[in-house]
Amino acid sequence: MLQKHPEAPPVAYDVIVVLGAAVWPGAQPSPALQRRILHAVDLLQRGYTTYLLVTGGVGKYPPAEAAVMQRLAVAHGIPPQHVLCEAQATSTFESALLCCDMLRQRGWSRVLLVTDRYHLPRALFAFWSCGLRAVGSAAPGKPARRLWRRWYYYLREGLALPWYLVRAVPVLLQRRRQAVEPQSTTRP
């Protein structure tokens, strides 16, 4: 389910997961990163949840995307203990795997996923592949000014979906096997 700006009364989510984007030199957030975290902060302040989980490792420039988002969230009034970080992932699929493990450990399953509109279908697919039924909320923003740039983003996402399917199937099968196989016990 895709929501541009949820207008209905807030639904209680366990957490908002915010996917990272580029960090620029000097630890500056790219416009996409800033859009995503500010949208998540707005949703949290409007009562959709009390926790953020920011995800993203180190890209071309340090620090980790998650660290930059955490700093921005705290600067906008979110208590530090309410901003969880996953700072290892280097792809959307890795973010999904690592975040899903963190969420399961906390018993959280009601997730609002924040990213850009063009990225949301693939991001939701990645989280669904890990067994988490997230709801998407696209960060508001202007589409790319140049038509070729917009086409580039949509083409890249369209080509990435089949690749994710290839990556997701083995992960799903492995997780199913682990869930079905009895735990081995050793006898003294």
Regions found by a protein language model. Name each.
Residues L147-R177:
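A transmembrane-helix-recognition feature enriched in membrane-embedded lipid enzymes
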Residues M1-V11, W163, R167, Q174-P188:
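N-terminal membrane-anchoring alpha-helices
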